[in-house]
Amino acid sequence: MITIPESDLVVHPLCLGSNIFGGAAPEAESHLVMDAYRSHGGNFIDTADMYNQWIEGHVGGESESVIGSWMKSRGNRADMVIATKVSKLDRRPGLSAKNIVAACEESLDRLQTDYIDLYYSHSDDETVSLEETLGAYAQLIAEGKVRYIAASNFTPARVRESIEFSEDNNL
Protein backbone atom coordinates (compact mmCIF):
# COMPACT_ATOMS: atom_id res chain seq x y z
CA MET A 1 0.00 0.00 0.00
CA ILE A 2 1.11 3.57 -0.60
CA THR A 3 0.02 6.93 0.73
CA ILE A 4 -0.95 9.55 -1.82
CA PRO A 5 1.35 12.54 -1.14
CA GLU A 6 -0.14 15.48 0.78
CA SER A 7 -3.01 13.26 2.03
CA ASP A 8 -3.87 10.45 4.40
CA LEU A 9 -5.25 8.31 1.57
CA VAL A 10 -3.62 4.87 1.74
CA VAL A 11 -4.18 3.03 -1.52
CA HIS A 12 -3.23 -0.08 -3.41
CA PRO A 13 -0.51 0.81 -5.94
CA LEU A 14 -2.81 -0.28 -8.78
CA CYS A 15 -5.86 1.95 -9.18
CA LEU A 16 -8.78 0.25 -10.92
CA GLY A 17 -10.10 2.31 -13.82
CA SER A 18 -13.83 1.96 -14.41
CA ASN A 19 -14.64 3.76 -17.64
CA ILE A 20 -16.35 0.68 -19.09
CA PHE A 21 -18.41 -0.20 -16.01
CA GLY A 22 -22.09 0.06 -16.87
CA GLY A 23 -21.25 0.22 -20.58
CA ALA A 24 -19.11 -2.42 -22.30
CA ALA A 25 -19.00 -4.23 -18.94
CA PRO A 26 -22.56 -4.68 -17.62
CA GLU A 27 -23.22 -4.23 -13.91
CA ALA A 28 -22.92 -7.91 -12.90
CA GLU A 29 -19.62 -8.32 -14.75
CA SER A 30 -18.33 -5.04 -13.34
CA HIS A 31 -19.15 -6.27 -9.83
CA LEU A 32 -17.12 -9.42 -10.49
CA VAL A 33 -14.15 -7.33 -11.66
CA MET A 34 -14.32 -5.21 -8.50
CA ASP A 35 -14.68 -8.36 -6.35
CA ALA A 36 -11.53 -9.81 -7.94
CA TYR A 37 -9.64 -6.52 -7.52
CA ARG A 38 -10.71 -6.30 -3.87
CA SER A 39 -9.74 -9.94 -3.21
CA HIS A 40 -6.17 -9.06 -4.21
CA GLY A 41 -5.99 -6.11 -1.82
CA GLY A 42 -7.27 -3.42 -4.17
CA ASN A 43 -9.03 -0.46 -2.59
CA PHE A 44 -8.65 2.42 -5.09
CA ILE A 45 -11.20 2.93 -7.88
CA ASP A 46 -11.21 5.75 -10.42
CA THR A 47 -14.34 6.93 -12.24
CA ALA A 48 -15.90 10.10 -13.68
CA ASP A 49 -19.34 11.60 -14.04
CA MET A 50 -19.01 11.48 -17.84
CA TYR A 51 -18.06 7.81 -18.22
CA ASN A 52 -20.22 6.01 -20.78
CA GLN A 53 -21.91 9.15 -22.15
CA TRP A 54 -20.35 8.22 -25.51
CA ILE A 55 -22.46 5.05 -25.75
CA GLU A 56 -25.82 5.40 -27.46
CA GLY A 57 -28.60 5.39 -24.87
CA HIS A 58 -26.26 6.35 -22.02
CA VAL A 59 -26.07 9.78 -20.40
CA GLY A 60 -22.94 9.55 -18.25
CA GLY A 61 -22.73 8.51 -14.63
CA GLU A 62 -23.32 4.84 -15.33
CA SER A 63 -19.88 3.85 -14.03
CA GLU A 64 -20.45 5.74 -10.78
CA SER A 65 -23.83 4.03 -10.37
CA VAL A 66 -22.30 0.58 -10.80
CA ILE A 67 -19.58 1.34 -8.26
CA GLY A 68 -22.19 2.67 -5.84
CA SER A 69 -24.35 -0.43 -6.14
CA TRP A 70 -21.30 -2.64 -5.63
CA MET A 71 -20.16 -0.79 -2.49
CA LYS A 72 -23.68 -0.87 -1.08
CA SER A 73 -24.14 -4.58 -1.75
CA ARG A 74 -20.72 -5.43 -0.28
CA GLY A 75 -20.94 -2.98 2.62
CA ASN A 76 -17.36 -1.91 1.98
CA ARG A 77 -17.48 1.86 1.43
CA ALA A 78 -15.23 2.58 4.42
CA ASP A 79 -12.57 0.26 2.96
CA MET A 80 -12.49 1.90 -0.46
CA VAL A 81 -10.84 5.05 -1.82
CA ILE A 82 -13.01 6.48 -4.58
CA ALA A 83 -11.78 9.05 -7.08
CA THR A 84 -14.20 10.71 -9.47
CA LYS A 85 -14.08 13.67 -11.80
CA VAL A 86 -16.09 16.71 -12.92
CA SER A 87 -16.09 19.03 -15.97
CA LYS A 88 -16.43 16.83 -19.07
CA LEU A 89 -20.07 15.75 -18.86
CA ASP A 90 -21.65 16.97 -22.10
CA ARG A 91 -24.86 18.19 -20.51
CA ARG A 92 -23.00 20.16 -17.81
CA PRO A 93 -19.41 20.94 -18.75
CA GLY A 94 -16.93 23.16 -17.00
CA LEU A 95 -15.65 24.18 -13.61
CA SER A 96 -18.03 26.90 -12.46
CA ALA A 97 -18.89 26.73 -8.77
CA LYS A 98 -22.50 25.96 -9.61
CA ASN A 99 -21.49 23.07 -11.86
CA ILE A 100 -18.96 21.62 -9.42
CA VAL A 101 -21.44 21.62 -6.53
CA ALA A 102 -24.29 20.17 -8.63
CA ALA A 103 -22.03 17.53 -10.17
CA CYS A 104 -20.72 16.55 -6.74
CA GLU A 105 -24.24 16.05 -5.41
CA GLU A 106 -25.14 13.87 -8.41
CA SER A 107 -21.93 11.84 -8.06
CA LEU A 108 -22.60 11.31 -4.35
CA ASP A 109 -26.09 10.04 -5.18
CA ARG A 110 -24.86 7.67 -7.89
CA LEU A 111 -21.99 6.42 -5.71
CA GLN A 112 -24.43 5.96 -2.79
CA THR A 113 -22.05 7.66 -0.39
CA ASP A 114 -21.81 10.88 1.55
CA TYR A 115 -18.22 11.71 0.60
CA ILE A 116 -15.77 11.48 -2.30
CA ASP A 117 -12.19 10.69 -1.34
CA LEU A 118 -10.50 12.33 -4.31
CA TYR A 119 -12.40 14.75 -6.56
CA TYR A 120 -10.68 15.71 -9.81
CA SER A 121 -11.13 18.54 -12.22
CA HIS A 122 -11.21 16.27 -15.28
CA SER A 123 -9.97 19.03 -17.56
CA ASP A 124 -9.16 22.69 -17.13
CA ASP A 125 -11.73 25.42 -17.74
CA GLU A 126 -9.88 28.69 -18.26
CA THR A 127 -13.19 30.54 -18.71
CA VAL A 128 -13.74 30.28 -14.95
CA SER A 129 -11.47 31.95 -12.40
CA LEU A 130 -9.36 29.81 -10.12
CA GLU A 131 -10.96 31.69 -7.24
CA GLU A 132 -14.40 30.40 -8.23
CA THR A 133 -13.31 26.84 -8.96
CA LEU A 134 -11.10 26.41 -5.91
CA GLY A 135 -13.66 28.18 -3.74
CA ALA A 136 -16.27 25.60 -4.73
CA TYR A 137 -13.89 22.78 -3.86
CA ALA A 138 -13.06 24.44 -0.52
CA GLN A 139 -16.79 24.62 0.24
CA LEU A 140 -17.27 20.91 -0.54
CA ILE A 141 -14.28 20.00 1.63
CA ALA A 142 -15.61 22.14 4.51
CA GLU A 143 -18.99 20.40 4.18
CA GLY A 144 -17.32 16.96 4.37
CA LYS A 145 -18.48 15.96 0.89
CA VAL A 146 -14.96 15.86 -0.57
CA ARG A 147 -11.76 14.85 1.21
CA TYR A 148 -9.10 15.88 -1.33
CA ILE A 149 -8.97 17.46 -4.78
CA ALA A 150 -6.81 16.84 -7.83
CA ALA A 151 -6.41 17.96 -11.43
CA SER A 152 -6.26 16.02 -14.68
CA ASN A 153 -5.42 17.35 -18.14
CA PHE A 154 -4.02 20.66 -16.87
CA THR A 155 -0.83 22.28 -18.12
CA PRO A 156 2.04 22.35 -15.63
CA ALA A 157 1.77 26.15 -15.53
CA ARG A 158 -1.93 25.98 -14.64
CA VAL A 159 -1.27 23.41 -11.91
CA ARG A 160 1.44 25.67 -10.48
CA GLU A 161 -0.93 28.66 -10.62
CA SER A 162 -3.63 26.65 -8.83
CA ILE A 163 -1.26 25.55 -6.09
CA GLU A 164 0.04 29.08 -5.58
CA PHE A 165 -3.50 30.47 -5.45
CA SER A 166 -4.52 27.82 -2.92
CA GLU A 167 -1.50 28.49 -0.72
CA ASP A 168 -1.96 32.27 -0.89
CA ASN A 169 -5.63 31.93 0.09
CA ASN A 170 -5.35 29.13 2.66
CA LEU A 171 -7.44 26.77 0.56
Question: Which role fits each region the language model picked out?
Answer:
Residues 1-80, 142:
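N-terminal binding-site loop/beta-alpha segment at the start of enzyme catalytic domains
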Residues 15-19, 48, 83-85, 119-122, ...:
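A cross-family glycoside hydrolase active-site/sugar-binding cleft signature
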Residues 78-90:
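A short, structured active-site edge motif that brings together acidic residues
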Residues 88-171:
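Glycine/proline-rich, positively charged
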